[in-house]
Amino acid sequence: MGVPFPIAGRQIALAIDEEDHAHDGAEMERRRGRPHACLWVFDVGDPAHIQPLSMFEVSELESPWSRAAPGRFGAHQFHERMDDDTLVYCTWFAGGLRIVDVADPLAPQEVGHYIPEPAPGQAGPQTNDVDVDKRGVIYLVDRGPGLNILEFKRPK
């Protein structure tokens, strides 16, 4: 996603490096220690020389359901519109919603998160999609429990 305004003097774009998921506990165990999908920040000021600036990752330790098979953990999707703010709203499967500030594109910082409880009989949440309306209301979709409607107050 291209950001429609410069941030810290740079024209940036964001991308999510989505990974395959483990189908069972044994496969999840083999993947232990590997990096998960993350949020990438690129300088796209010169399209002929796109440069990676940074990546934002979430540790498995940040979610009690990160290793709940047959689930997924890692970046999945982000809200695909940035109007005049530097906040990026990302879904992280079992890591829930992550709100990341890219005001410093070299060092993105998490400023908020929400992890829904899994649905009954589900090993962990699988947060799948996020949308944010013009009022700042967050609509978070999980494959199990369904829809969460949230508000976020940016820290001062």
What are these regions (language model features)?
Residues M1-K156:
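Feature marking well-ordered beta-strand scaffolds used for ligand recognition
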